[in-house]
Amino acid sequence: MVVHYVGNPGTTAAANRSFFANLALTHETYASAHFVVGLEGEILQCVPLTEIAYCSNSANDYTVSIEVCHPDDTGKFDDATMESLEQLVAWLCETFDLDPAKDVIRHYDVTGKICPKYYVENEDAWLTFREDVSARIEEDNAASGETN
């Protein structure tokens, strides 16, 4: 699973989904993502999980891509966005039996591109995010009586 940040600060999830939909019609370039997480925590699916999204270069055919909206040039996600991102990533990890510590990566980890910017520039924050996803999975499993 690859986490990205959108290249246009302050835009909505709906605007980014529309951008991808327009590219599919114009064939101007190949760019898409499976999901976009918005500034208010909304999660929009753009591409079915059974199809390839063009977002992660050489990793496109075996990853799920998530674009994340952010309010400004720092690239830091706000609280509502982070809550939904954690929820989505935890659900995807549970669905596909993935380990957040190994299987959740940044676009940077595939290509070296500074994306998602805040989590490339703040490695500790990235590690904390993955730990938070693991904790959410454990909480979900405890609530449902499952064990890993």
List each language-model region with its residue ranges:
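Active-site-adjacent loop/helix surface patches within enzyme catalytic domains
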Residues: 1-98
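Basic/polar, cationic surfaces and motifs that engage anionic cell-wall
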Residues: 71-148
